[in-house]
């Protein structure tokens, strides 16, 4: 590792100290990411722009260390054209962790706020989102927080999904309070358990509707109102969905909702064509078991201009979630994090065992 790569500089960005290697210059604030501060920067090694996410004090508590470890593992594992790529990672002498990723010019939230999207852009953006999900879902990874602001887009209309830090194993006891409300699948609110990759399809369906219509399809004011606005379009939850509700309180709430009939999607989206409406209805099915999969959605006639089964890979192996049930002390997560970072930089962990943390964390590769 060169001296240049292993030396750090402190830079103040709008009152926040970024302690980065000298490889990164021209830091400019972008905003808050999931659990971290975001900056744009110039990578002196490549000459190109990058995004720097600072996760503050990940070793201050086991829950923070575990969450950061999960994000690191996922970024390393999920290598796909439509998922944001990890370019570099290091732990600063101040023990903050920095993720360096590709920098894309804008996100879908900003695009939708500025102007209506033309049909070919709606089609191409939807295709790329589903292409990413076809890759991650067989790996046992669910994003769980898909929304326009974490759909990144560059000037060539290349799309990449970011913020997989909240993603978790498809297990029967998935924790309940995740996705931004407008894009949250009804089964999350109804059961808080036993949900899977279908929640991502619902979220992308909501984004699809928003791209068509120019406004959120289900703008709930709170948890209760969210379910109400869903039933105003889709009608009352069907019996097969109600029967999955395990909470008595939730069951009583659903039973007390006014009985509603489904509204025609063609009436709700008068500017959409028949293929758009058909796919949208398949994505926004109340019953997650009947909701279309990413692979089947890619094969839908609406996406025929882009669909190519030979160029829509799935993950080769399932993501190893064995760490996720571990209840470890912070120091153990720290050791595991250093090991993952060394592995990312292709450093032989055994040969580096005598190195001190300050010399093993710099971003050199």
Curated annotation (Swiss-Prot):
It comes from Wallemia ichthyophaga (strain EXF-994 / CBS 113033). Belongs to the protein kinase superfamily. Ser/Thr protein kinase family. MAP kinase subfamily. HOG1 sub-subfamily. The active site is at 145 (proton acceptor). It is found in: Cytoplasm; Nucleus. The TXY motif contains the threonine and tyrosine residues whose phosphorylation activates the MAP kinases. The modification Phosphothreonine is found at residue 175. Its EC number is 2.7.11.24. Phosphorylated. Dually phosphorylated on Thr-175 and Tyr-177, which activates the enzyme. Rapidly dephosphorylated upon either hypo- or hyperosmotic shock. GO terms for molecular function: ATP binding; MAP kinase activity; protein serine kinase activity. Its cofactor is Mg(2+). It holds the Pfam family Pkinase. Keywords: Activator, ATP-binding, Cytoplasm, Kinase, Nucleotide-binding, Nucleus, Phosphoprotein, Serine/threonine-protein kinase, Transcription, Transcription regulation, Transferase. The gene is HOG1A. Activated by tyrosine and threonine phosphorylation. Induction: By hyperosmotic and hypo-osmotic stress. Less induced than isoform HOG1B under the same conditions. InterPro entries: Kinase-like_dom_sf (IPR011009), MAP_kinase (IPR050117), MAP_kinase_CS (IPR003527), MAPK_p38-like (IPR008352), Prot_kinase_dom (IPR000719), Protein_kinase_ATP_BS (IPR017441), Ser/Thr_kinase_AS (IPR008271). Residues 24-303 form the Protein kinase domain. This is Mitogen-activated protein kinase HOG1A. One of its GO terms (cellular component) is cytoplasm. The modification Phosphotyrosine is found at residue 177. SMART domains: S_TKc.
């Amino acid at each position: 590792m060169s001296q240049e790569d292993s030396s750090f500089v402190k830079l103040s960005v709008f009152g926040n100290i970024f302690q980065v290697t000298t490889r990164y210059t021209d830091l400019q604030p972008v905003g808050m990411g999931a659990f971290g501060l975001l900056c744009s920067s110039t990578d002196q090694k490549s000459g190109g722009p990058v995004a720097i996410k600072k996760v503050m004090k990940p070793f201050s508590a086991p829950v923070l260390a575990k969450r950061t470890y999960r994000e690191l593992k996922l970024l390393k594992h999920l290598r796909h054209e439509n998922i944001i790529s990890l370019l570099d990672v290091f732990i600063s002498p101040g023990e903050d962790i920095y993720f360096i990723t590709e920098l894309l010019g804008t996100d879908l939230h900003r695009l939708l706020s500025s102007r209506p999207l033309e049909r070919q852009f709606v089609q191409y953006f939807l295709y790329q989102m589903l292409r990413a999900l076809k890759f991650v879902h067989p790996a046992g990874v669910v994003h769980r927080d898909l929304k326009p602001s974490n759909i990144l887009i560059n000037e060539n209309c290349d799309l990449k999904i970011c913020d997989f830090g909240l993603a978790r194993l498809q297990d029967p006891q998935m924790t309940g309070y995740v996705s931004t409300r407008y894009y949250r699948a009804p089964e999350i609110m109804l059961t808080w358990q036993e949900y899977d990759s279908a929640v991502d399809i619902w979220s992308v369906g909501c984004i699809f509707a928003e791209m068509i219509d120019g406004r959120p399809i289900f703008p709930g004011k709170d948890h209760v109102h969210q379910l109400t606005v869903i039933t105003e379009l889709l009608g009352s939850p069907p019996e097969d969905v109600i029967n999955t509700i395990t909470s008595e309180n939730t069951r009583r709430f659903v039973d007390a909702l006014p009985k509603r009939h489904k509204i025609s999607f063609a009436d709700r989206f008068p500017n959409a064509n028949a293929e758009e409406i058909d796919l949208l209805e398949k994505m926004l099915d109340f019953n997650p078991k009947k909701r279309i999969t990413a692979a089947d959605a890619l094969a839908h006639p609406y996406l025929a201009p882009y669909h190519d089964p030979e160029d829509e890979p799935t993950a080769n192996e399932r993501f190893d979630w064995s760490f996720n049930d571990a209840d470890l002390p912070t120091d153990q997560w720290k050791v595991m994090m250093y090991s993952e970072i060394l592995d990312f930089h292709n450093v032989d962990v055994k040969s580096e065992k005598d190195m001190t943390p300050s010399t093993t964390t710099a971003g050199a590769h």
